[in-house]
Every structure is written in structure tokens, then in C-alpha cells.
Amino acid sequence: KVRKVMKEFGRDYEVIVFDDASTDGTREVLERYRRVLPMRVLTTERRIGYPGAVERLLREALNRTSYPKRDIAVLLQADFTESPDHIAPLVNAIEGGADVVVGAVQANGIPLPRSMRLARWVAPFLLGRTFGSAPVSDPLSGFRAYRLIVLKKVLRDFGDRPFLTTEGWAANLELLGVVAPYARRMGETPVSLRYDIQARPSRFRAIRTLRGLLRVRRERWEGLERRKTD
């Protein structure tokens, strides 16, 4: 699917996949894809979770570019819930001048898992002003495109220190708070999710995610708001 989309889109690309200590034959499947795709596979022997995987992927994308002002990293799940069909609109928005573009999740008639519906309903009340002050309408979505120069500026300040420490959707909010001070312009484009074709049960946990959102609000976003008013 990625190959078809990118061929029609007409952009050079490389797929970077993170195999988070999988035990379900993922490595064998990826080996077959490497024969037909420009693909690089990162692996770990011990599971590091969603925030660690996202950070590894973004750091690797930055390490592999010679043109950070031009090149773009698009993050999407490899379990088919996020469709490659949305890559082109995300990239087009970056090429149109944005530094970060978020895929804002839209209803498509296919219900989200109950725990996710609960978390999405509670999160705006839990986050309060933090949710309303976010530069995009869906700060919880992880389906995003980043101009790599923004990540380069992030790593200039963070160095080897991890910039993501919170699990699940909370990590998406945390990452938005990390990159926002370095982005001149942020945008969004509508995307839809397909949890009905997910190959394995979701690891999403609503209560853990909501607790993480509270921590991110205190440690990342409230600090960001204070810096804006200083």
C-alpha cells in the first residue's frame, strides 16, 4: 500500500520500521517487504513501548537526512489502523509552509474501541485549558508529519536525553508540547482510523492514558504556557 501511494504521489521516500521486540513473526514479514520497498528496520530485544519507539524512529529519520529543511518524517501505525492514503495530504501541508501537521481524526462510521471512545470523551474535560490552547484541534492524534529541521532544533536542546516519557496518547500530547516552541506554523488535515481491520487486540489502556495526560499537562503544557506569558 505504501509503495502504491508513494508511486502515485511522486516523492522519494524511505520506510523506517521499528520492531519493538515482537514475537509474532514480524521480522520475517518485514524481511519480505524489504525486497520490494526502500526499508530500514530498527529492532530491540526488550520492549520499550510507544514513546521509546516513536523517539527512536524520529532520531533515526533525522540521522539519515542531509536536507532537514526539506525532508519530512510521517509517523503512522504499522497495524493498518492509519492508512497510507493520508500521507500525501500531510506532506502537501508541510510543503505548503507548515512545520508540523497533525492528522485530525474524523468519524467514518466505524466505531473506535470502547476504551478509546471513553478516553477521547474524557480527555478534553481532564485537560481543560490545555486542550483548548493546543495549536491543533486533535492534539491526541499521533498520525503526523514533521519537517525534520524542527526535530533537529529539538535535539539540539535535548541532546541524548529522552524527550518522550509518557505512554500512549499522552506521548502524542507530550510530543506536541516538545515541538510546538520550534515550529513556525502548525496545521492539520482530516484522517480516518480503521480499528475494524486491526490484526491484533489494541494495547490501549484508558485509565493509564488519562493519568499520563494529567502528568503531561502539568509537566509540559503548563510550563509551555508559563514561558509564553513570561
What are these regions (language model features)?
Residues K1-K4, E8-D12, R32-Y33, D157-D230:
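Hydrophobic helical membrane-anchoring modules
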Residues S66-T81:
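Short beta-strand-to-loop acidic/aromatic patch adjacent to the donor-nucleotide binding site
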Residues R11-A21, L42-T44:
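Short beta-strand/loop segment that forms part of the nucleotide-sugar
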Residues D19-E28, F80:
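A conserved acidic beta->alpha catalytic loop
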Residues E14, P38-R40, P135, R185-G187:
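Conserved beta-strand segments of alpha/beta enzyme cores
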Residues M39-A61, R70-I72, P84-T165, D196-F204, ...:
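Acceptor/aglycone-binding surface of glycosyltransferases and processive sugar-polymer synthases
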